[in-house]
Amino acid sequence: MEKAWRIYIRKGWNITLLKYIGNIKGVKVQIAQESMNSHVLITGMSGSGKSVRMTDIEVESIKEGKTVLVLDKDGTHYKLSKSYQNVISVLEDGLDFRLLEPIQAAESMEEKKVQVMYVADILAAGQNLGDRQICCLRTAVEYAAEHKDKDATEMYTISRCLEEQKGNSAEGVRSRLWGILNGNLLRPSAKQIEPGKINIISLAGINPKTQIQLIEIILSVVWRQLRYRQFSKVDVVCIDEIQSLSLKKNSALFELLTESRKYGISLVLATQSLSVFNKKEIAALGQTAVKLYFHPSEQDIRSIAQQIDPVAYERVAMVLKNLRKGQALTVGDIEKAGHKIGGPIVTMSQFWKEEHSKFEISNNTGGR
């Protein structure tokens, strides 16, 4: 068994990007081969079919030989046969990152400093820490790398060093990261990412603030390891309820959206409404190759229609209003049977028809 699921080298860097996004009358609709990226944005009201389509995309991805990582905040992902999915409960199983190992393996002081900054940046992801707080965190990380055997986990050692530093800055960091440092969540685990499966990282039972921190940390690990060409076990990352995550420039999610094609990773992002995002965030999300608009709320119909077609928005609004459960108005770089599709089309989820038979699914999501 692998020691940790984060450090693997992809031999030859055989990039396999996401393809399938839905179907029309049994014919698969895919992201166009010449698209600048293979990211997908899914929006729509609760119960409109977003989660089924996301699962549909996940299943098709593993059928193509890809490995999928799903960040499931509330443990409400559709349950599939064990032959398709691998569930890692962070609360029960732990999440095996072993962030300090690269620091310990550093062959020079310069490399060690780089690795310390790398780990501190991961832990600080999305926290808006000040310069003094970052300095305190780096000191704690460096100390922990040298003394981690004194505690049960790496995070406990970092927490202890922050406490021993005293002062408002160190205490502020420790307070801000309390759930991560003292929750026994990032720890050695027997559960690992399994190639060719839908790997569901369940954050169920963890308080909402710590859930968001964990997602930011996971995305930061994925992004930074991609940049160093060390993270190769995941091809597709799926995240629901993205409105809680940072989309600021230099955030992990922003970097993955804008730079990850050359590293061979695809994002599938979902949210109920785009109205909660500011203009800069919408611009970042606008870089996704394909948008799947499921039935929106009444107040969102007009704005979405105008984004899709500023001239003929009334016609688009009527299509959005009449979407049935499982249907999505699909916009972007798409093709069907190898032919590029020019305008918006309505697609359906293949998984919708098969969910009670072929994939042994049981819906525990309350109709998402």
What are the residue ranges of the model-derived segments?
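P-loop NTPase motor domains
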Residues: 3-9, 56-265, 269, 278-281, ...
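C-terminal regions of RecA-like/P-loop NTPase motor modules
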Residues: 3, 277, 282-285, 293-368
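Conserved lysine of the Walker
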Residues: 50
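Basic- and hydrophobic-enriched, low-structure N-terminal and domain-boundary segments
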Residues: 1-45, 53-57, 97, 338-340, ...
